[in-house]
Amino acid sequence: MKYFILSLGCTKNQADSEVIMGILESKGYVRSLNPEESDLLIVNTCGFIAAAIEESIEEILNLVHLKKPGQKILVAGCLVQREGKELAKHLPEVDLFFTPREINNLDKLLADLGENNKLVLSEPGFLNLEKKPRAKSNEVYRYIKIADGCDNRCTYCTIPAIRGKYTSRPLDDILEEIKDTLKQGIKEIILVAQDTTAYGIDLYGEFKLVELLRKIGSIKGNFWVRLMYLYPDKITPELINEIKENPKVIKYVDVPLQHIHPEILKKMGRKGSSEEIISTLERLRKEIPDITIRTTFIVGFPGETEEQFNYLLDFVKKFKFNRLGAFPYYREKGTPAAKMKGQIPKKVKEQRYEKLMEVQQEISLNLNKALVGKKIPVIVEKKIRGENLYLGRTYMDAPEIDGIIEIKAEKRLKKGQIINVLITDYDIYDLKGEFIND
C-alpha cells in the first residue's frame, strides 16, 4: 500500500504532516511521490489567508481529477478546521476530512474509511502529546513544534480561531523528541510555534524558552538550533544572552514585526511600541554583532497612508534587515481588520509590496557582497551537478524562505555536515563558496 502526501502552508503544518506520515508508515504504507500509483492521496491544507485557501482547494481538485477507482482522498489541516462543513458539502469525491487534533485518531479513521465522504471535526490544536510516530521527510533539518495556538489577538489574523489558545508542550517531551531526532542523523533543530517566545507561560506560569535552550545546549553532539517566530515584546535580556552564549543556538532570529509605524501597530493589535521594538532590535545587534535578523512586514493594512508606508520604508532602509519577507494585506473574514474603514485598493498594495522588496533586494545584495572573502558556517543539504559541487545553507539562512549557497569541495561532503565555507561570489539572495578544510 502506498500513500502520497502534499503538505501546504507553514512549518507547523509540516511537523503535523510528518506525524501523519509516521502513523501511515507504522501501518505498512510506503510513501510515493506519484499520486497516480498511490492508494491514499492526502492534502494537509493551510487556511491562513485567501491565497493559501485557494492553493489548498486547487490541490484538492487536482487530486479529485486524478482519482481512480480504489483510491481514497484524505484532506486534513487548518482549512478543514476553518471551513470543514463547506468543503464536505462541495467535495463529495473526498473520502475523509479531518482536523489537526484528529491526527491522534488517524488509525481508527483509516479503519472506518467507508464509501461516503466523512467529516470529523474537533477542538483546534495538535501537539502530538500521545507521541505518535513521526516520519523523516528531510535528512538535514526538522521543525520541532514547542507549542500550538496563539493568545495574541492581532486584528488581521485568523490563527487563534483556527489553532486555538496557546498550548505549550511539556519541556521533557520536547527534549525527548530532539534527542530522538538527533539519533536519526538530523543536524538542524528548528524550534517553531505561533509565538516561540511565549513558550511555557500557560504550562508553567512563566516563560521557559531560555531554560529549554539551556537544556538543549547540554545535549552532546554537533548540531544547530534555529529560533523562528520570536515576538519582539518577549525578547528579554536573558534570551538575548542565551542566544549569544549557547554554542548550539545559531546566531539567527526570525522576528515578525508586521509594521513599525505606531498607529498601524496599534490598529494591528501588536504589543510593544515602535521605540521598544527598535530598542530590542538594536540590543540584539549590539550584544550579538554577527546575528542575522529576519522579519516580515504587511503592507497595505487598512488605513495605511502613503506617509505611514514611507515611515516603514525609511525604517527598513536604515535598519538593513539581513532577511525580510513581505505580504500585501489580505482581508480575512471574521477578523476585526476586515471591518475596518480605509481598505487599500489591491493595486496600491501590490505597488507598496514591490517598492518594499526592491529596497530589500538592494540591501540584501550589498550585505552578500560584504561576505566575499569571509568564512561562514554552512550546513550541507545535497550534492548537485558534477563531482565536487554541493548545495547548502549558511547559518544565516532558514530552509525554504532564505537563500542557499553553492559549495565547491575537493573532498566528499555528507548531508547534514556542518563546515566552514569561504565566500567567493554572490547575487541578491544566494552565495557561492569553497569548502575550507580547517
UniProtKB/Swiss-Prot annotation:
Q: Which residues form the signal peptide?
A: none
TRAM domain location: 369-437
For this UniProt record, give its keywords in alphabetical order, as a comma-separated list.
Answer: 4Fe-4S, Cytoplasm, Iron, Iron-sulfur, Metal-binding, S-adenosyl-L-methionine, Transferase
Q: Which domain of life is it from?
A: Bacteria
Compartments where located = Cytoplasm
One example of the protein's molecular function in GO is: aspartic acid methylthiotransferase activity
- Gene Ontology process terms (BP): tRNA modification
Where would you say this protein principally sits, based on its record? cytoplasm
Q: Where is the MTTase N-terminal domain?
A: 1-115
Which reactions fall under this protein's catalytic activity? L-aspartate(89)-[ribosomal protein uS12]-hydrogen + (sulfur carrier)-SH + AH2 + 2 S-adenosyl-L-methionine = 3-methylsulfanyl-L-aspartate(89)-[ribosomal protein uS12]-hydrogen + (sulfur carrier)-H + 5'-deoxyadenosine + L-methionine + A + S-adenosyl-L-homocysteine + 2 H(+)
Cofactor dependence is on: [4Fe-4S] cluster
Protein family: Belongs to the methylthiotransferase family. RimO subfamily.
Q: What is this protein called?
A: Ribosomal protein uS12 methylthiotransferase RimO
What organism, scientifically named, is this protein from? Carboxydothermus hydrogenoformans (strain ATCC BAA-161 / DSM 6008 / Z-2901)
Gene label: rimO
